Swiss-Prot record:
It is a peripheral membrane protein. This is Protein translocase subunit SecA. Its EC number is 7.4.2.8. The gene is secA. SMART domains: SecA_DEAD (SM00957), SecA_PP_bind (SM00958). HAMAP family: SecA. May bind 1 zinc ion per subunit. Zn(2+) binds at C889, C891, C900, H901. One of its GO terms (biological process) is protein targeting. It catalyses: ATP + H2O + cellular proteinSide 1 = ADP + phosphate + cellular proteinSide 2. Its cofactor is Zn(2+). The lineage of its organism: Bacteria, Pseudomonadati, Pseudomonadota, Alphaproteobacteria, Hyphomicrobiales. SUPFAM superfamilies: Helical scaffold and wing domains of SecA, P-loop containing nucleoside triphosphate hydrolases, Pre-protein crosslinking domain of SecA.
Amino acid sequence: MVSLGVFARKFFGSAYERRLKVLRQKVAQINALEEQFVKLSDEQLCQKTDAFRKRLSEGENVDSLLPEAFATVREAAKRVYDMRPFDVQLIGGMVLHDCGIAEMRTGEGKTLMATLPIYLNALEGKGVHVVTVNDYLASRDAETMGKIFSFLGMTTGVILHDLDSDARRAAYACDITYATNNELGFDYLRDNMAFDRSQMVQRGHHYAIVDEVDSILIDEARTPLIISGPLEDRTDFYNLIDTFIPALIPEDYEIDEKQKTTTFTEVGTEKIEKMLEQAGYLKGESLYDIENVAIVHHVNNALKAHKLFVRDKDYIVRNDEIVIIDEFTGRMMPGRRYSEGLHQALEAKEHVAIQPENQTLASITFQNYFRMYRKLSGMTGTAATEAEEFRNIYGLDVVEVPTNLPVQRLDEDDEIYRTAEEKYRAIVRDIRQAHEKKQPILVGTTSIEKSEQLAERLRKEGITDFKVLNARYHEQEAYIIAQAGVPGALTIATNMAGRGTDIQLGGNVEMRIRQELQDIPEGPERTAKIEEIKKDVKQLKEKALAAGGLYVIATERHESRRIDNQLRGRSGRQGDPGRSKFFLSLQDDLMRIFGSNRMDGMLQKLGLKENEAIIHPWINKALEKAQKKVEARNFEIRKNLLKYDDVMNDQRKVIFEQRMEVMNADDLSEMIHEMRNDVVEDLVETYIPSGTYSEKWDVKALEEELQQLFNLELPVKEWAKEDGIAEEQILERILDAVTKLEDERTERYSPEVMAYFQKAVLLETIDTLWRENLVSLDHLRSVVGFRGYAQRDPLNEYKTESFELFQSMLKNLRRIVTSKLMRFEIIQQPTEPSMPEQTGADSSVFNDQNQENAPPLWARSQENRFVNPQDRDPNDVTTWGKVGRNERCPCGSEKKYKHCHGAFV
């Protein structure tokens, strides 16, 4: 019997089919305009941009411009590059405009498709960010697609890692900006560490299109972007801890490859304790005593570095440095470092220079960064397997965009062998057969080590004409990929995700022109050579097609089905023929971790002989089930990370908004006044609680606090003896005294100097306390999980305690800022120029490069001048010169300088 759901789908169509139907109707509207737009001159087509902007300014909705705007871009692409976007690309463009994820097969033209919604949304004048995975793709796409936008009167900028602030600011000011996800995130963090608005580079987060969206928003979601500063050097300690691990035997520790964790057994813990005790580092009796928390952390990192992290798979050693390898793409990630001491443990393991640990100055995850955009969309070749995560976390629906031509690639069943040795023999045999008929072959491996092992096997078998593409040789990446579709080409590559360059049968025309004609100037000779190259590529493509198209061989299944699909998708682009096959063994990581012992026993019972493969749908289903388990686990990890990061993100928003308010304010006196009153009220409430008798008042402590914070000596003790006096009256008298002191101080300096000093103190204090708060939150996060053993929800505990930390930080902020502003003295050298005006980013005061090592204006004083103590006037701080921290304060208080006027210097 047919279910109601099946009947309804047959009658009404699925949600996907209904959505496609609506999009195809819009495509028909765009196509109907084509004849009209073809007749326009170049100038008339360019003028469409101003006409659209005018209509928007008059109140028209951007959605209503879509058919005309898309028709405009289509016509411009035809005139600039002789490329006419297909109907399916128009569909993909509409998905992106509607804040969805367009899943398009490799080679279907995602880059050109993106120009349609980019142009439409850039008309609003608020900036469009196009996000790529590396600088090469950002600059390539900005250069190629920028010509279309320039033709239509729009500006295009690109953010590269080596640009200075002025160049970045100019790029962000363009209508369209191409950049990597890392550069965007770090620029956002740096903007929120700036002293002045003129130092900021970004101008908001209006609309972003993320290329390879699954790589950026899924694979990298677990890694926060961190700007950090160095802590003390502990090289000797890391090297010492590293010497302990080789002395351990397998019984001393346990490894969980599924969860990627390591733990010491009881025997192993005793061994480590003895070694630490002999080295003089163990405090108390046990490694797990509270005094040894930091040591436990470092010992665990050393164990992880040796037992979980594999050289040439997880990282490589290059130029005396540990360089992380992206597990999903096989790319090196220079500049990235593991946090919390793990990177230092790896450096000690490999005996390279150990860099100091860093303190977090600012951080954000990609999840929270990209959720700031008012409109967010993405495109990729593989997103369907992660559709639930995109919907739950980012509110993005995945739409599979139909291919322009039917896919002709043959995806063959997996071949499974008992051992890795048998598997590699079969792979080499298959490669030889395909190579002999000149079929282009792409072999995908999961690590550098395995790609080089396969390369060595091929050499021993007499096959030497191949290219290896992995993190070691990434500089040659684009050229190797460009030639991977040539007849007879054999390319061995680590994971292909995010490579960004299509494998075109016959070779890549543009790449060959750049390589072969770089020294030939424009002219008849160059034109003739270009035609020769095009003709040659066309002939080579015909040979590659005759050989069966690109053959993709995978040597292992990845944890994620998406990565496997990306590798398959390299073949069969734009309707070309091709084939793909996975060769597996029970010794592969995925099979070994997820229960291959049971499978091995079954295969033995079935009588599987050496060098025999088994091909069975049941095994494919078992593999897919294992992959789904890993994907679900990783999703839970990312979802959990987001829950904790959301707590920090709420605090981050408050702090960054507060900083922005301070930076933008011309007059901060009202904010300072409120802070000062809050501090005084808190003090009075602490030492003279409302509703209590005077006998309970601690007026002596209140007097000391007032002296410490405000440098005010007030007779609070005498006031408290007055008949019938209430705490409100004492509060009022203190506020009057503080206000009088503040007014006297304000009169001594110009409004410009006061405003500058107030801003400097506020921003410096906010940044310092926020850094300390981040450290506290990290520590809280690392231990809060143990609350689960006490039947308490770790997340709720984290929320509660992080809120208390935040409240404490804000209270400290008010106290420190108030005290600094009530106690400061600005001492200006006679030769010091007058307060300069801000003239923009190049002003000598506001330019980071010019002022890199100089103290801010308010801190430049005669404090380094040594003065005879007899020549110091207690009432004139300008006569004190340099005062030692432990000297008696020259003011006459008899306190040490560091506890009096030097408390906040």
